[in-house]
Regions:
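Flexible N-lobe loop architecture of eukaryotic-like protein kinase catalytic domains
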Residues: 8-11, 110
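AlphaC helix of the eukaryotic protein kinase fold
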Residues: 1-6
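Conserved short submotifs of the Hanks-type protein kinase catalytic core
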Residues: 22-36, 40
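Activation-segment/catalytic-loop signature of the eukaryotic protein kinase fold
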Residues: 18
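Protein kinase catalytic-loop region centered on the HRD/HxD motif
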Residues: 59-69
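Activation segment of protein kinases
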Residues: 84-119, 123
Length: 203
């Protein structure tokens, strides 16, 4: 979080203070009063707002990628809104973790279900900034349609779909974004957009 605290960007949560005690750590950060993107998707997002949010998230990713930080857990619940409709990226806790863990209860309920994971992340392979771009593509699809592009009954089935299933087609009303979506959701990192800065160029 130290690097994040040094970043001054409108689409990244502002961190005012960091501290570590003998048995605890504390973070004082900006109060975000507009709810999260997960809630907003459930309510329904206009095409105009979906594109605006996409640009803002891409701008935040470009900023953190530029200083060598990967988010690794990009999902609607980690994207907050302010009252003025601006986006703030939060929860960089996974940025320091080298391994992704999925926990499962005795009943088989999955925590951290990999709806937003890139194929390489889902398979436990090395990731770079292009993995975050893939996750953003999943979120963009969900903002435009209200549905996740890949759904299944188990984590492994979702991971398989990310790696093998065709990229779903957007509804006709928003089909003009299909080319961008294809470039974000390409299975191989080298076939994707190579930088978050490229996103606005496709809009």
């Amino acid at each position: 979080y130290e690097l994040i605290a040094e970043i001054n960007h409108p689409n990244i949560v502002r961190i005012y203070d960091l501290g570590v005690g003998d048995d605890h750590a504390h973070i004082a950060m900006e109060y975000l009063d507009g709810g999260d993107l997960k809630q907003r998707i459930a309510e329904g997002i206009t095409e105009r707002n979906a594109v605006s949010y996409l640009k803002q998230i891409a701008s935040a990713l470009a900023e953190i990628h530029g200083v060598g930080i990967l988010h690794r857990d990009l999902k609607p619940g980690n994207i907050m809104l302010r009252k003025d409709e601006s986006i703030a990226l939060i929860d960089f806790g996974l940025a320091k973790r080298l391994r992704l863990r999925m926990e499962m209860t005795d009943e088989g309920e999955i925590f951290g279900t990999p709806y937003y994971m890139s194929p390489e992340q889902g398979h436990g392979n090395g990731v770079d900034h292009r993995s975050d771009i893939y996750s953003l593509g999943v979120i963009f699809y969900e903002m435009l349609t209200g549905e996740k592009p890949f759904r299944a009954g188990s984590a492994m089935a979702i991971i398989y779909q990310h790696a093998r299933a065709p990229i779903p087609l957007l509804p006709t009303r928003v089909s003009q974004y299909q080319a961008l979506l294809n470039m974000m959701l390409a299975k191989q990192p080298e076939d994707r957009l190579q930088s978050a800065t490229e996103v606005p160029e496709w809009l």
